[in-house]
C-alpha cells in the first residue's frame, strides 16, 4: 500500500445527466468531467464514479435507462485524466443510499446477491466484467448497510471479488498498480452495530474502508448539531451507544469500557470504534468528509443556532415547495433547501444575505447562522480540514474520502486544501492546537494501552486487582482468590497489551 495518503473523491452523475451529457451547458450537467482539471487530477488518488446498481439478475449493472454509448463516453473522459496522474485510479461505486438502503429500490437485489455461493460468484464475476469492459481500476461497494443476517454472505462476496481482482491484476500485468476493492462504511454506531462483530473479516479483503463520517446530524433529529464534528462539545447532544448490542460476546465490564453511553456522535468516535477492534489496520481506515452542508430552519439564536430545536421537515424527498435557505439557487433547482454544496455556501456567505460564519472550537467545525430568518447550516471548509488532516496523520489512517467532487467551488479549493495539508513540503501543522473537544474514551482489544506486568504463574491464587501478563496481554482480576488462567473465565479483564 502506498505511503501517500489516499484522497478519494466521488464523481456523482445521475442517469439523466449521463444520457444528455454535455460539457458546455451546466444547466444540463452541472459538473462535467472537464471541470476536473489536470491540477485536480494530480491531487486525487481515486475517483469513485457513482452509482451503478445490482439488477434483478443479481449482477452489477447500470441503471437500465442508461445510454451505453454516453456512459462509455463519460467514463472514457474520466480515465483520460490518468494521463495527468498515472497513479490515479478510476473506481466505480455500486449502490448508494437510493438503491441500497433498507427501503431502497434495489435493496432485495443486494440481499439476494450475497445469499448463496452461486449468487455470490455471479455477482463477483459481473463486477470484474464491468470493471474490465469500461476500463475501471477497481470496485467500490456502497451498500447502506447489510443487516446482521446478511453479513456472512457480504464477507464471502467481498472475499470472492478480492480473489478475482488479484487474479485479474496478475493477468493484466498490473502489479505496480493493482485493481482495488473498497467499501463505504457506516460513520455512526447505529448502522455500524449491524456488522461490528465481524468488522475485521469485512476489512480483511479490502484496500480501504471509507467511513461516511458525515450526516451525523440532520433534520431527522430533534435538535440541530454539527454533521461532521471532529470532537464532541459538552453543550451538544449525546446518544445511546448501539455498539453495546453488537453481539460481541463480551462481558458487561468490557462492553461498558469500550462503549461509553451516552456519547458524542463524532468523527473521532467512529474512527476509534474501528481502531479498537483487533484486525482493523489504521492504514485501511479512510475518513469521510462532506463537501456540502446541512441546513435547518426555525432555530433559536441563543447559541448561533447550535443545539436548538428546529422545524425542518425530515421526510425524503423534501415534501414542500418552500425553499427557505436564503440565497441558495441550487436548493430551488434540486427542490430541497436542506442540502447545499460548499460552492453554494461560499456564494451565500459572500453575498449580502445576512449569514454569519461562526466557529466551534470544540468540534473544530464552522457553521452558518442567519439570525433574522432563524437558519443554521453545518458544514466543513478548509479550516476544519486542517484539524481533520492532522488527526488522520496522528492516527496513521489511510487518508480521506469526500462526497462529492461537484460540490467544491470552481477552483477546487477544498480539494487543494486537502492536498496541501497532506503533501506540501512547506506545510507544518506541528503547532496546530487540536483543542479540548470531547474525545471518545472507549477502549477495546485493538487499542488497549501498552503495559507491563509480571507473568502469570499457574497454580497461584491472585487477589482482587492483581495484574499479570499472559499470551501477549495484561490481565486484571475482578475479584479475589482467583486460581484460573486469564481469559478462561469471567474472573479476568484484559486491560493492556505487551509491547
From Swiss-Prot:
Keyword annotations: Carbohydrate metabolism, Chitin degradation, Glycosidase, Hydrolase, Polysaccharide degradation, Signal
GH18 domain sequence ranges: 42-425
An annotated GO cellular component: extracellular region
Recorded catalytic activity of this chain's protein: Random endo-hydrolysis of N-acetyl-beta-D-glucosaminide (1->4)-beta-linkages in chitin and chitodextrins
EC class: hydrolase
Signal sequence coordinates: 1-41
Molecular functions (GO terms): carbohydrate binding; chitin binding; endochitinase activity
An annotated GO BP: chitin catabolic process
Record-linked SUPFAM superfamilies: (Trans)glycosidases, Carbohydrate binding domain, Chitinase insertion domain
Keyword S-adenosyl-L-methionine: no
Active site: 144
EC numbers, comma separated: 3.2.1.14
Residues noted as binding chitin in the record, renumbered to the chain: 68-69, 95-98, 145, 212-215, 403
Source taxon at top rank: Bacteria
Family in the record: Belongs to the glycosyl hydrolase 18 family. Chitinase class II subfamily.
Protein name as annotated: Chitinase B
SMART domains associated with the record: ChtBD3, Glyco_18
Entry-linked InterPro entries: CBM5/12 (IPR003610), CBM_sf_5/12 (IPR036573), Chitinase_II/V-like_cat (IPR011583), Chitinase_insertion_sf (IPR029070), Glyco_hydro18_cat (IPR001223), Glyco_hydro_18_chit_AS (IPR001579), Glycoside_hydrolase_SF (IPR017853), Glycosyl_Hydrlase_18 (IPR050314)
Domain Chitin-binding type-3 as annotated: residue spans: 438-498
Amino acid at each position: 500500500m502506498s505511503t501517500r495518503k489516499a484522497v478519494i473523491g466521488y464523481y456523482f452523475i445521475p442517469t439523466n445527466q449521463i444520457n444528455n451529457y454535455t460539457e458546455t451547458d451546466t444547466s444540463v450537467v452541472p459538473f462535467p468531467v472537464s471541470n476536473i482539471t489536470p491540477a485536480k487530477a494530480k491531487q486525487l488518488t481515486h475517483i469513485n464514479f457513482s452509482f451503478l446498481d445490482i439488477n434483478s439478475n443479481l449482477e452489477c449493472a447500470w441503471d437500465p435507462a442508461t445510454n451505453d454509448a454516453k456512459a462509455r463516453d463519460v467514463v472514457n473522459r474520466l480515465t483520460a485524466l490518468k494521463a495527468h496522474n498515472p497513479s490515479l485510479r478510476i473506481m466505480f461505486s455500486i449502490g448508494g443510499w437510493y438503491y441500497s438502503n433498507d427501503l431502497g429500490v434495489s435493496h432485495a437485489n443486494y440481499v439476494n446477491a450475497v445469499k448463496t455461493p452461486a449468487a455470490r460468484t455471479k455477482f463477483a464475476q459481473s463486477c470484474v466484467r464491468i470493471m474490465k469492459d469500461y476500463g475501471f481500476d477497481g470496485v467500490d461497494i456502497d451498500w447502506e448497510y447489510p443487516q446482521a443476517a446478511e453479513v456472512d454472505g457480504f464477507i464471502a462476496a467481498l472475499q470472492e471479488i478480492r480473489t478475482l481482482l488479484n487474479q485479474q491484476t496478475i493477468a493484466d500485468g498490473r502489479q505496480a498498480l493493482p485493481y482495488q476493492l473498497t467499501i463505504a462504511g457506516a460513520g455512526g454506531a447505529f448502522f455500524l452495530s449491524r456488522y461490528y462483530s465481524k468488522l475485521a473479516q469485512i476489512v480483511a479483503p479490502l484496500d480501504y474502508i471509507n467511513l461516511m463520517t458525515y450526516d451525523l446530524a440532520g433534520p431527522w433529529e430533534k435538535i440541530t448539531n454539527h454533521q461532521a464534528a471532529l470532537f464532541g462539545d459538552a453543550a451538544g447532544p449525546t446518544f445511546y451507544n448501539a455498539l453495546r448490542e453488537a453481539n460481541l460476546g463480551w462481558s458487561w465490564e468490557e462492553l461498558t469500557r469500550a462503549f461509553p453511553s451516552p456519547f458524542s456522535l463524532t468523527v473521532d468516535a467512529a474512527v476509534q470504534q474501528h481502531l479498537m477492534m483487533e484486525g482493523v489496520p489504521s492504514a485501511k481506515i479512510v475518513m469521510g468528509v462532506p463537501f456540502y452542508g446541512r441546513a435547518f430552519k426555525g432555530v433559536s439564536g441563543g447559541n448561533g443556532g447550535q443545539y436548538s430545536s428546529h422545524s425542518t421537515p425530515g421526510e425524503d424527498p423534501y415534501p414542500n415547495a418552500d425553499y427557505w435557505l436564503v440565497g441558495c439557487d441550487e436548493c430551488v433547482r434540486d427542490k430541497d433547501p436542506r442540502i447545499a454544496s460548499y460552492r453554494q455556501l461560499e456564494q451565500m456567505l459572500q453575498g449580502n444575505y445576512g449569514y454569519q460564519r461562526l466557529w466551534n472550537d470544540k468540534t473544530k467545525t464552522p457553521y452558518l447562522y442567519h439570525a433574522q430568518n432563524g437558519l443554521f447550516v453545518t458544514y466543513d471548509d478548509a479550516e476544519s480540514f486542517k484539524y481533520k488532516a492532522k488527526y488522520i496523520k496522528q492516527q496513521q489512517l489511510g487518508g480521506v474520502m469526500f462526497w462529492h467532487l461537484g460540490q467544491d467551488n470552481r477552483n477546487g479549493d477544498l480539494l487543494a486544501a486537502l492536498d496541501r495539508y497532506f503533501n506540501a513540503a512547506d506545510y507544518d501543522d506541528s503547532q496546530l492546537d487540536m483543542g479540548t473537544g470531547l474525545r471518545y474514551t472507549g477502549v477495546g482489544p485493538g487499542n488497549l494501552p501498552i503495559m507491563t506486568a509480571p507473568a502469570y504463574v499457574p497454580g497461584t491464587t491472585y487477589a482482587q486487582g492483581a495484574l499479570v501478563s499472559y499470551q501477549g496481554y495484561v490481565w486484571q482480576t475482578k475479584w479475589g482468590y482467583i486460581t484460573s488462567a486469564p481469559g478462561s473465565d469471567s474472573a479476568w479483564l484484559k486491560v493492556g497489551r505487551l509491547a
